[in-house]
Amino acid sequence: MTQVEVKILDDRIGQSIPLPEYATQGSAGMDLRACLDQPLTIEPGQTQLIGTGIAMYIGDPNYAATILPRSGLGHKHGLVLGNLVGLIDSDYQGELKVSCWNRSNQAYTIEPGDRIAQLVILPVVQAQMSIVEEFHETDRGEGGFGHSGRS
């Protein structure tokens, strides 16, 4: 298992607000929670940046973290990430913050400690670009969106 350094920035983390953890053995992501002093209502169409009270340092350039939406919040309440996906580089050491966008027609209130997103650690391959005049021909070629069909 890969070790990731986590710094607690708010004394409530690990006390009244749980640390991120995997819910089950098969969980790919850990829930990130809102580190708020009071409830926060996000009006329709509004975006808010919400702190999690933790900073992390992955340290290994072979890994990165992504912040992804929680499916229930998006499907049931229209609360998704304002930047769609958050990418945390291995050398970042600051607080994890979640951009929450209310795309619904109803206001949504986030309570202190609510689960607002999930954190997934992923392997990274850094590629080196090689300039060429032409590519080796493939069946797909330059066919883009929808080119491979529907079935």
From Swiss-Prot:
Keywords: Hydrolase, Magnesium, Metal-binding, Nucleotide metabolism. Its cofactor is Mg(2+). It holds the Pfam family dUTPase. Its EC number is 3.6.1.23. It catalyses: dUTP + H2O = dUMP + diphosphate + H(+). Pathway: Pyrimidine metabolism; dUMP biosynthesis; dUMP from dCTP (dUTP route): step 2/2. InterPro entries: dUTPase (IPR008181), dUTPase-like (IPR029054), dUTPase-like_sf (IPR036157), dUTPase_trimeric (IPR033704). GO terms for molecular function: dUTP diphosphatase activity; magnesium ion binding. GO terms for biological process: dUMP biosynthetic process; dUTP catabolic process. It comes from the Bacteria. Substrate binds at residues 70-72, 83, 87-89, 97. This enzyme is involved in nucleotide metabolism: it produces dUMP, the immediate precursor of thymidine nucleotides and it decreases the intracellular concentration of dUTP so that uracil cannot be incorporated into DNA. Belongs to the dUTPase family. This is Deoxyuridine 5'-triphosphate nucleotidohydrolase. It comes from Idiomarina loihiensis (strain ATCC BAA-735 / DSM 15497 / L2-TR). The lineage of its organism: Bacteria, Pseudomonadati, Pseudomonadota, Gammaproteobacteria, Alteromonadales.
